[in-house]
Amino acid sequence: MNFTVKYSFLVICLLCCLLSTYVSVIEGHRARPGESRKNPREIIKTFKESGKGIIQGYYPSWVSYNHNLKDLNPNLNVVHMSFAKMDLSYDSIESIVGSPLLFKSLIGLEYIGLNEYFNDAMNLRKARPDIIMLLSLGGETYHPSSFDSALNAVEKIANLVDELGFDGIDVDYEPNGSFDGLNDKEKADFFVQYVTKLREYMCDDKLISISQSSNGALSCIGFNDPKKICMDDEAPYNSKYFNKPDVKKELLRAAQMASAGGAIYLMNNLKDMIDMVFVQTFNYTNSTDSTVMKELYDSYAYYGKKYDYVIIMGFTLMFPSTPFNPNDKMLVKSIGDFVKTENKLNKRADGFGLWSLSSDNAAHNEQLAIEYFVESLH
């Protein structure tokens, strides 16, 4: 009898817990813009008005087993939660609550279940109501099984963003699970269609970020491109620029890579539908000239000013051989001074970002890098 009472009490507690989570999810995430926090667009606007650069970081969901979101560096302004599937599929939020182990297999985020994610996100929101949190899709981890499956998932993604309390979406453009195939027109057209549909389904206050390769805004010169998908004659880093005799050798090499110009077609078609571009500089290796990061930023800044994007130059903590070492104080200051000047002149909020936060395998010091970012941008 005593065992039966205890068992019944346990079942009731479990049902109450599930019901509580269900209600909070159905009503939407409690950390909504309003009395407790600003609209994410208003947060971005305050950075632009002050000329302060945004500091961003990718938080891989799989590190949540050893780390907590609320313990992130207080100087971070934007967090990309990675990675979810571009073609995610689930029947309803209630079904994930009822079977928490489905969260990873259906959504992609590597939490044990929805409750674990929800508590982690709420702790961050309580500690940092000013932080912007985006759900990052795709990347090397999850490229869609088909274009149609990804497009059919957009409405679910928009609902998930709202129900789980994200401030928007980041879409990592690696169509083959790598930087190969960036200049394939069919894949580029799909990406434009995918992001356009996301914008249609998401609330106006939500942000859209796209992640691109380091040389994505340099016109390609290494191969014939009759459709000019990776060229822009009106941009400063066009084919004429690369015919100049004084072009940096490493910048010329970047324009000759197969990934060169991979963002040009996307930005010129998406225009002001997106809000932020994260530049993944870790595809640029085997270089001894780290100064080209200035030109790489400048190539994206042209589109940032044209379409009002925030440009985030990404550093990596993972590879000791990267030419863009986030713990190189002089490099960070040099690029930061240039970015800060542009921000002040143009009322922009361009900044720096990290791949990836809280990684136990980091080759560089996360806290030191963020300290250097703050010193150089603010």
Swiss-Prot record:
Annotated phenotype, changing residue 203 to S: Increases catalytic activity and chitin binding. Loss of catalytic activity and chitin binding
Q: What is its EC number?
A: 3.2.1.14
GO BP annotation list:
chitin catabolic process; polysaccharide catabolic process
The name under which this protein is listed is Chitinase
What is the organism of origin for this protein?
Plasmodium falciparum (isolate 3D7)
Q: Give the highest taxon in the source lineage.
A: Eukaryota
Similarity field: Belongs to the glycosyl hydrolase 18 family.
Catalytic residues in the record: 174
Keywords per UniProt = Carbohydrate metabolism, Chitin degradation, Cytoplasmic vesicle, Disulfide bond, Glycosidase, Hydrolase, Polysaccharide degradation, Secreted, Signal
| Biotechnological utility | Potential target for the development of transmission blocking vaccines. Antibodies against CHT1 neutralize CHT1 catalytic activity and when fed with the parasite prevent parasite development in the mosquito midgut.
- Its gene is CHT1
